[in-house]
């Protein structure tokens, strides 16, 4: 091989390596702690038949899970000298499945860079909204109960969800009254209301949640692109309700980004993580010096 060809091959290899690094999807550096939500034979509501499985790949590097018959969460702890905030992350998937890496573990990895513990929720799917709602209620109670064990600040436990997971997170943040399942153990003595909520292109908000927004609703950040024609109107209505009730809120509304991008967008919506970080700092979840 000539010297010119060697140089060309070296440059090509370098370019390919750089492209590979750029396209690599972030994942938490350390394996997480897996916690089942319910004791054996104590799960309330309707069970999901079948065994958890991964849906066929679609060529978009998204791991889609379904048939979640044993709901759980995985804790990805932040490295922090002081107790850290924690966020329960609910992936979307239309309540039919979970975009587990794109809207779950990749988000937990980003939260870790902010000094936040990410808790990725596997809630009951498919077609089990009430079971999923019971799952997120149980999850926030377990996180608060075991906060000292995981070095979490119990006063800074929030929720974050995408698409259907955004609906699930919003539903918890507007919920008043007791849990929708009977007390099982001491974890169920913990509060239900999140300290804050982050909703990424949330779905179904205009299907009954908007009238439930009141002065007790969790402080809420919404990120949504206008070209998500199916669901943007729900976010608009939810934002108006937050504003009317003087609930602390922020709405990053941009022109392009569509639906289902997670942290991967190259459109206008790609700056939403920075906007969210700034808002979390503003409301005191993150330290202002970060």
Residue ranges and their predicted role:
Residues 24-81:
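N-terminal cap/lid segment of alpha/beta-hydrolase-fold proteins
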Residues 83-92:
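Short beta-strand element of the alpha/beta-hydrolase
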Residues 91-96, 226:
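Active-site glycine-rich loops that stabilize anionic/oxyanionic intermediates
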Residues 99-101, 106, 120-153, 264-271:
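Catalytic nucleophile-loop/oxyanion-hole region of alpha/beta-hydrolase
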Residues 134-216:
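Primarily recognizes the serine-hydrolase "nucleophile elbow" in alpha/beta-hydrolase
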Residues 216, 222-224:
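Short beta-strand/loop motif that positions the catalytic acidic residue
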Residues 229-236:
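Conserved alpha/beta-hydrolase "acid-adjacent" motif
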Residues 239, 243-290:
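C-terminal catalytic histidine-bearing segment of alpha/beta-hydrolase fold enzymes
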